[in-house]
């Protein structure tokens, strides 16, 4: 279990439930298939394993892992629009009258209900790691919407969830721009070969660089004309590489082979043991990586009133 993306949230108070109570709470909103007339469903599933006995909360030392699954019926908008248009034209031709918005909307609703049972189904899962002692929730997603879906549903089942996105004192854009300009990153961080540069004007240009020497004159010229770094590929120690963006989202997270080999050795021959070992090692690595990242970005900013 290696996360590929990271959205970082700060618990502003202690988590109001322990692992056992959390297990009970998640069981009140289990993931389930869409009924024939449902567009979407959302609920919790076991992060590891299948079957009724698989726990909804995986506990490893001081860390908890949960997973939510969304199931949705896919109705292409173009298909619905074409069907509505065809039905409206049929009514107007047969009844010699104009179909207005209210009736058109009703026709659309009827067509959606008729198409729903035949629609394709898409499933997607979102994992979140909870580190109560560190006061963090880490969501394995680069989409704030998907993270908020999980967090709001978690809040619903436990009654309260005092959490906010972790913020830093120095804007990531300012720090990343300085690192590329000076060709020197914070201790243990290394600039790699990919970045995105944006003009500070609203309608300014965007330059995306991949497999390029970011110390080159071309890059420095873009920076000297006012562009700033909004995404930057980085490595930390010899343990992981990632892409950092201007909103402090960690994307394309990749753990180096040394860590993965260690997890394989620690996990034994069973699949569950391998998953547990990789999750534990990942969280221990985050325990060093995240404080270093926050410090490199000027330290954590606590909003007023919190």
Curated annotation (Swiss-Prot):
InterPro entries named in the record: RdgC
Q: What is its main location?
A: cytoplasm
Q: Supply the alphabetized keyword list.
A: Cytoplasm, DNA recombination
Lineage: superkingdom:
Bacteria
One GO cellular component term of this record is: cytoplasm
Q: Which GO terms describe its biological process?
A: DNA recombination; regulation of DNA recombination
Report a single Gene Ontology molecular function.
double-stranded DNA binding
Q: Where in the cell is it found?
A: Cytoplasm, Nucleoid
Entry's family note: Belongs to the RdgC family.
Q: What does this protein do?
A: May be involved in recombination.
| Name the UniProt record assigns to this protein | Recombination-associated protein RdgC
Q: Mind giving the lineage of the organism this protein is from? A: Bacteria, Pseudomonadati, Pseudomonadota, Gammaproteobacteria, Pseudomonadales
């Amino acid at each position: 279990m290696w996360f590929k993306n990271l959205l970082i949230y700060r618990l502003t108070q202690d988590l109001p439930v322990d692992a056992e109570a959390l297990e009970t709470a998640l069981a009140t909103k289990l993931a389930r298939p869409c009924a024939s007339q449902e567009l979407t469903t959302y609920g919790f599933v076991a992060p590891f394993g299948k079957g009724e006995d698989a726990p909804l909360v995986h506990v490893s030392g001081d860390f908890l892992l949960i997973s939510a699954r969304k199931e949705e019926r896919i109705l292409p908008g173009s298909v619905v629009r074409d069907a509505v248009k065809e039905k409206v034209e049929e009514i107007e031709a047969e009844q010699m009258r104009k179909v207005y918005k209210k009736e058109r909307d009703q026709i659309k609703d009827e067509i959606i209900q008729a198409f729903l049972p035949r629609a394709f189904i898409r499933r997607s899962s979102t994992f979140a790691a909870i580190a109560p002692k560190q006061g963090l929730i880490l969501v394995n997603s680069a989409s704030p919407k998907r993270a908020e879906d999980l967090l709001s549903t978690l809040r619903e089942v436990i009654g309260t969830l005092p959490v906010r996105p972790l913020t830093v004192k120095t804007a990531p854009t300012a720090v990343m721009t300085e690192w590329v300009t000076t060709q020197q990153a914070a201790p243990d961080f290394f600039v790699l070969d990919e970045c995105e540069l944006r003009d500070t004007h609203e309608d300014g240009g965007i330059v995306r660089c991949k497999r390029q020497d970011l110390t080159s004159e071309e890059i420095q010229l873009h920076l000297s004309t006012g562009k700033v770094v909004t995404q930057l590929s980085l490595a930390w120690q010899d343990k992981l590489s990632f892409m950092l963006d201007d909103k402090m989202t960690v994307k394309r997270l990749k753990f180096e082979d040394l860590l993965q080999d260690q997890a394989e050795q620690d996990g034994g021959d069973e699949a569950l043991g391998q998953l547990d070992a990789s999750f534990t090692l990942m969280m221990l690595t985050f325990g060093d990586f995240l404080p270093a990242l926050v410090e490199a970005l000027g330290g954590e900013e606590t909003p007023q009133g919190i």
